[in-house]
C-alpha cells in the first residue's frame, strides 16, 4: 500500500512507471494500424481522432478511473476483487455460479493478454530501427531476433526482482510522456485546426458516412485503450489517488500526441509509422535518442504486465482457483514483489512464439483487442451488478451505458477472429481450462475423500490416547478445516496409532479480504488435542514457522496428506497430472523438510 508520507509528485511518477506503460506505448502503433486500413482523408482523420479521444474518456476515465476504482477492497482492485465483493452481496446459487464463471473468463483473458502485449510493444518499438539512415534495408528476421533478445533479457531479469531498477521506471516514463507531448504539440502547430477533432460530432459523422465499415474500425480504435484495465488492477500497489492523478497527465499527453499524429497523417498519408516518421521529420538528430526511449518504454510496459500476471496468478493460487506453484518473494519490504518461475518461463516462450508467428506489429494488431474488450465487458457487467446491490444505485445507469459501449467494441472485435484474433482465445483457453479442471477437481476430490466429523473421530481418539503409549513431543497435522478430519489423519492416529503427547490440527483459512493475518490456538478438544487456525487475506504471505513460534508450539514432526488418485475419467486424470506436477501444500508454504512426513491416501475418483 502507498505510504502516507509519499508526496503528490512521488505518487504520480511511480504510477507512470508501474501502471501506464501499456496504454502509454499505444501511440507507437494505434494510428499506423488504423490508417493502414482506412485512407487518411480529412474526414477520416477527424472522425478517427474523435473516436480515439472519446474511447479514452468513456472506457478508461469513466469505466476504470471513476467507476471501477471506487470499488476497492482494502485498496486492492482487479477481477478477483470484484468476484469477492459480489460473493458477499449475492445469495448462493446460480448468480454466484455466473459471477464465478465470469471472473474465470476475465482472469483467463487478462493472462492471455500478458502474452500479446509484450510481443506487440517490443516488436513495434524495434521496427523503428529501419528509419535510421543506413539501416533501411534491415531484414525482417533481424528485427524479430532483436525483439526476441530484448524479451529474453527482460524475462531473465525477473528472478532478480525489479525492486532495484523499478525506481528508474517512473522518471523514464515521465520522460516518455514528455516526449509524446512535445512531439504532438510541434505537429499540432503545423495544423492547429486538428484540435477541433476532440468534438464528438466528428465521430458521429464518421459513423453516418461509413456505416458498417466504421463499426469495424472500432476494432482498431480499441488499441488506444489497451492497458486501461491496469488502473484498477494495480490499485493495490500504489493506492487510488496517485493513479488517478497520474492519469490526468497521461490522458493529456496521449490526446496531444494522437492529435499531432493526426495532423502529420493529413500531410504525410503515405508514412510507414506516423509516430516515428513524425519525430524524425521534426528532428533527425533526436530520432535515435527517441527510439532508445521508445524501446525502454515498451520494456517498462512489458515489465508492468509481467508483474501483473504474477500478481493475478498468486491471487488465483490463494483463492484456490489455480494449482499451487513455487513462489519467490523478491523484495524484503514489498509484499507485492513476487516471482513465479514456471509462469515466467512459460510466458517467455509464448511471447517469442507469438513474435515468430506474427512477425510484424501490424499483423499482431489483428489479434490484439479481443481479450481487452472481453475483460472490459466483464468488468462492466460485474460493476453494474455490484452498484445495483449497494447504496451506489445512482451509478447503475452510467455503468450500464459504459457496458453497452464495451459490448459494441467486443462485437466489432469478433471481426478479428479469422485474422489472428483466435490466438487471444487459444491463449486464454489454457488458464481457463486449468482453472475449471482445478476447481472442479478439488471439489470432487474433497467429496471422494469422505472426511470424518470431529465427534466421530474423538470416540476412537480418546480410547487410543488413554492407553498411554503416546510418542513424546508435539505432532502437527495439516487439515483443510480444523473440525473436519481428512482420511490421512484417521490412517495415522486411529489405524496406525501414531499419536503424540500433544497433537495439533493446523488449518489455513483464506478470507475474502486482500490483507490481514490472525492466528488462534484453540485448546481442549480432547486429551492432548488442540487446533491451530490461521486466517489470512488472499494476498497475504504467510510465515507458518514464525506463527508457530509466536504461540510457543515446538513441533517434532509435521504430517500432511498426499492423494494418490485412481480414475478412469479423462478430466480427473488431467487433474491428477496437474496435482503431481505442482508443489504440494507444505512445499508451497516452505516448511522445514527435515520435519515433514507425507502420508499417502489412495482415492477413487
From Swiss-Prot:
Belongs to the HAK/KUP transporter (TC 2.A.72) family. The keyword Transport applies. Transport of potassium into the cell. Likely operates as a K(+):H(+) symporter. It comes from Geotalea uraniireducens (strain Rf4). The chain crosses the membrane at residues 17-37, 45-65, 96-116, 140-160, 165-185, 211-231, 246-266, 286-306, 338-358, 367-387, 394-414, 417-437. It is a multi-pass membrane protein. This is Probable potassium transport system protein Kup. Coiled coil: none annotated. One of its GO terms (molecular function) is symporter activity. The gene is kup. InterPro entries: K+_transporter, K_trans_C, K_trans_N, Kup. It comes from the Bacteria. It catalyses: K(+)(in) + H(+)(in) = K(+)(out) + H(+)(out). Keywords: Cell inner membrane, Cell membrane, Ion transport, Membrane, Potassium, Potassium transport, Symport, Transmembrane, Transmembrane helix, Transport. GO terms for cellular component: plasma membrane. It is found in: Cell inner membrane.
Amino acid at each position: 500500500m502507498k505510504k502516507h508520507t509519499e508526496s503528490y509528485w512521488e505518487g504520480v511518477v511511480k504510477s507512470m512507471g508501474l501502471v501506464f506503460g501499456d496504454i502509454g506505448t499505444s501511440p507507437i502503433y494505434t494510428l499506423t494500424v488504423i490508417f493502414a486500413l482506412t485512407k487518411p482523408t480529412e474526414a477520416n482523420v477527424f472522425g478517427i481522432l474523435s473516436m480515439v479521444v472519446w474511447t479514452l474518456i468513456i472506457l478508461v476515465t469513466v469505466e476504470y478511473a471513476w467507476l471501477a476504482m471506487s470499488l476497492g477492497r482494502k485498496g486492492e482492485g482487479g477481477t478477483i476483487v470484484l468476484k469477492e465483493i459480489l460473493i458477499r452481496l449475492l445469495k448462493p446459487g446460480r448468480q454466484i455460479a455466473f459471477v464465478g464463471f465470469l471472473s474465470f473468463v476475465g482472469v483467463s483473458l487478462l493472462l492471455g493478454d500478458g502474452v500479446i502485449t509484450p510481443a506487440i510493444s517490443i516488436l513495434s518499438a524495434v521496427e523503428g530501427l529501419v528509419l535510421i539512415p543506413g539501416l533501411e534495408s534491415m531484414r525482417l528476421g533481424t528485427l524479430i531476433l532483436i525483439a526476441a533478445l530484448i524479451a529474453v533479457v527482460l524475462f531473465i531479469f525477473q528472478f532478480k526482482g525489479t525492486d532495484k531498477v523499478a525506481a528508474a521506471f517512473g522518471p523514464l516514463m515521465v520522460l516518455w510522456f514528455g516526449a509524446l507531448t512535445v512531439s504532438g504539440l510541434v505537429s499540432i502547430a503545423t495544423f492547429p485546426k486538428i484540435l477541433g477533432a476532440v468534438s464528438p460530432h466528428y465521430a458521429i459523422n464518421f459513423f453516418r458516412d461509413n456505416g458498417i465499415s466504421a463499426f469495424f474500425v472500432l476494432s482498431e480504435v480499441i488499441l488506444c485503450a489497451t492497458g486501461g484495465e491496469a488502473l484498477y488492477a494495480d490499485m493495490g500497489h500504489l493506492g487510488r489517488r496517485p493513479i488517478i492523478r497520474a492519469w490526468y497527465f497521461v490522458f493529456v499527453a496521449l490526446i496531444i500526441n494522437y492529435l499531432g499524429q493526426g495532423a502529420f497523417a493529413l500531410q504525410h498519408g503515405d508514412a510507414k509509422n506516423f509516430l516515428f516518421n513524425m519525430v524524425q521529420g521534426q528532428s533527425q538528430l533526436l530520432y535515435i535518442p527517441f527510439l532508445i526511449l521508445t524501446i525502454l518504454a515498451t520494456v517498462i510496459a512489458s515489465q508492468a504486465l509481467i508483474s501483473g500476471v504474477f500478481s493475478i496468478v498468486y491471487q488465483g493460487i490463494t483463492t484456490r482457483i489455480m494449482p499451487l506453484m513455487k513462489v519467490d518473494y523478491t523484495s524484503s519490504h514489498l509484499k507485492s514483489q513476487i516471482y513465479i518461475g514456471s509462469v515466467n518461463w512459460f510466458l517467455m516462450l509464448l511471447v517469442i512464439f507469438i513474435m515468430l508467428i506474427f512477425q510484424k506489429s501490424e499483423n499482431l494488431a489483428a489479434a490484439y483487442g479481443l481479450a481487452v474488450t472481453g475483460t472490459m465487458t466483464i468488468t462492466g457487467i460485474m460493476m453494474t451488478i455490484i452498484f445495483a446491490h449497494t447504496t451506489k444505485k445512482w451509478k447503475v445507469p452510467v455503468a450500464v451505458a459504459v457496458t453497452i459501449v464495451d459490448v459494441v467494441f467486443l462485437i466489432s472485435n469478433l471481426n478479428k477472429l479469422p485474422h489472428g484474433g483466435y490466438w487471444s482465445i487459444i491463449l486464454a483457453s489454457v488458464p481457463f481450462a486449468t482453472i475449471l479442471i482445478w476447481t472442479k477437481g478439488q471439489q470432487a476430490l474433497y467429496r471422494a475423500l469422505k472426511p470424518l466429523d470431529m465427534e466421530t473421530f474423538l470416540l476412537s481418539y480418546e480410547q487410543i490416547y488413554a492407553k498411554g503409549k503416546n510418542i513424546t513431543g508435539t505432532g502437527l497435522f495439516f487439515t483443510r478445516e480444523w473440525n473436519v478430519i481428512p482420511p490421512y489423519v484417521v490412517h495415522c492416529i486411529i489405524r496406525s496409532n501414531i499419536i503424540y503427547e500433544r497433537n495439533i490440527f493446523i488449518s489455513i483459512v483464506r478470507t475474502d479480504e486482500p490483507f490481514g493475518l490472525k492466528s488462534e490456538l484453540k485448546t481442549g478438544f480432547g486429551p492432548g488435542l488442540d487446533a491451530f487456525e490461521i486466517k489470512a487475506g488472499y494476498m497475504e504471505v504467510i510465515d507458518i514457522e514464525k506463527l508457530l513460534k509466536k504461540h510457543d508450539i515446538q513441533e517434532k514432526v509435521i504430517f500432511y496428506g498426499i492423494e494418490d488418485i485412481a480414475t478412469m475419467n479423462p478430466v480427473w486424470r488431467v487433474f491428477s497430472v496437474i496435482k503431481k506436477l505442482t508443489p504440494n501444500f507444505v512445499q508451497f508454504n516452505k516448511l522445514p523438510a527435515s520435519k515433514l512426513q507425507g502420508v499417502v491416501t489412495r482415492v477413487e475418483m
